[in-house]
Amino acid sequence: MSHLVAGYPTDELSFTAARALVDGGADILEIQLPFSDPSADGPAIQGACTEVLKRGYRTADGLAFIERLHKSFPQVKIYLMSYGSLVYTPGVENFCRRAAAAGVTGMIIPDLPFDHDEGLTAACRANGMENIPVAAPSMAPARLDLLARAGFPYIYAALRTGITGSDTTIDDSTRRFLDAVAAGGSKIYGGFGISSGSQARALSDQVEAIVAGSVFVRLITENKNNPDALYKTVRAKAEELTTL
């Protein structure tokens, strides 16, 4: 699963990056709607969100971008990632209807607790989508077990505490955490600090898919003045991460 910030640095270059990811083997795109206080994200994604929002980018613009991706790459699942405020503002049910109409398959809203989601899970399912809750190593064991056995088809496992961006070491504690998240039979997406093929291979026997985001945003930032280089570097990294 590959993560992009919608509209960064422009819609066209964001689309170029998405095409590079798909051509490089990504079968799930996680598209982040820019938010002013992305509390789970590191400097690369925070900076991208800030730049896009300065242009006056709106939720409607992000959904239009997702719809374009869905029409261009119908074989690819699209997950929408953002924060609770963007979901609450238009109303949870209204937001979910709009997301589903744009082609969204699932929602990842990391600041909404799985058991106090203001009706997000029900609204997602009513519109043919899944809410994908986030599990973190900092969760108390009893609460983590409650999430694991809550019946969600998919759970996003944040592989360490803190924010996205810096590299994560895959060790025995990581594996024990993933075992705990999977205890109820949910399929697991593992992310936070994934940037290399070796990390992806180390996780491949325990997760449905790895999630990589900051590494792609950094490549986009480094090459935003050269679309050809942007495409080539993003595609090469996607190929590295999907070759197991």
Q: Positions of the model-derived regions?
A:
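Conserved, mostly hydrophobic/aromatic
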Residues: S2, L21, Q32, A99, ...
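Glycine-rich beta-to-alpha transition loops that act as phosphate-gripper elements at the mouths
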Residues: V5-T10, M81-T89, P113-F114, A135-M139, ...
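Active-site-adjacent beta->alpha loops and helix N-cap segments on the catalytic face
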Residues: S36-G47, K54-E67, V87-E93, I109-A126, ...
